[in-house]
């Protein structure tokens, strides 16, 4: 089975994902739980994670130059902290090099370089930065992590994660 999103691209993964979530839902029901309760159990056991994407649009030729300059600046001056958490690893997929907090540089084993930067923080967070290949924008993918002490603590964990995301955005100047 497969689906097309109307642009000629065939998407098989979404159909597979629907089948898997249906199987998980059936398992949860057989065990007297809802999908939501199962998700809360996962958060309590493994931690809470929140992802947020920021698209910074820079139209025109000057915008393309700004985006290029932003990438060059992040590459030359990687952040030391993001949202109050120390950056412990920086990855540059264009140069295929990664640098740890002590300044040790090692190679990234990938067949093809890509204009992507990633920063990993001490508290388990991650920020990926890349220019769009089709639009005049630079994209920031922010992931923050935290603990969730109980099934009923979701609202608190989510609010704390949102605060972390805002702090990371401030650190990045976006």
Question: Which residue ranges define each predicted feature?
Answer:
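Active-site loop ensemble at the mouth of alpha/beta enzyme cores that anchors a bound cofactor
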Residues: 9-15, 74
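Short glycine/serine- and small hydrophobic-enriched flexible loop segments
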Residues: 19-27
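Catalytic-core signal marking the mid-to-C-terminal active-site face
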Residues: 31-174
């Amino acid at each position: 089975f497969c689906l097309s999103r109307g642009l000629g691209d065939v998407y098989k993964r979404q159909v597979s994902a629907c089948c898997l979530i249906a199987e998980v839902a059936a398992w949860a029901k057989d065990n007297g739980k809802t999908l939501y309760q199962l998700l809360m159990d996962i958060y309590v056991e493994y931690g809470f994670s929140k992802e947020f994407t920021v698209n910074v649009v820079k139209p025109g030729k000057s915008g393309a130059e700004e985006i290029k300059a932003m990438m060059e600046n992040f590459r030359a001056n990687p952040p030391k902290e993001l949202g109050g958490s120390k950056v412990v690893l920086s990855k540059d997929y264009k140069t295929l090099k990664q640098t740890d907090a002590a300044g040790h540089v090692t190679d990234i084993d990938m067949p093809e370089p890509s204009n992507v930067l990633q920063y990993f923080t001490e508290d388990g967070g991650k920020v990926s930065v890349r220019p769009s290949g089709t639009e005049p924008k630079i994209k920031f993918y922010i992931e923050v992590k935290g603990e969730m002490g109980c099934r009923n603590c979701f609202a608190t964990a989510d609010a704390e994660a949102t605060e972390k995301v805002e702090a990371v955005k401030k650190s990045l100047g976006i």
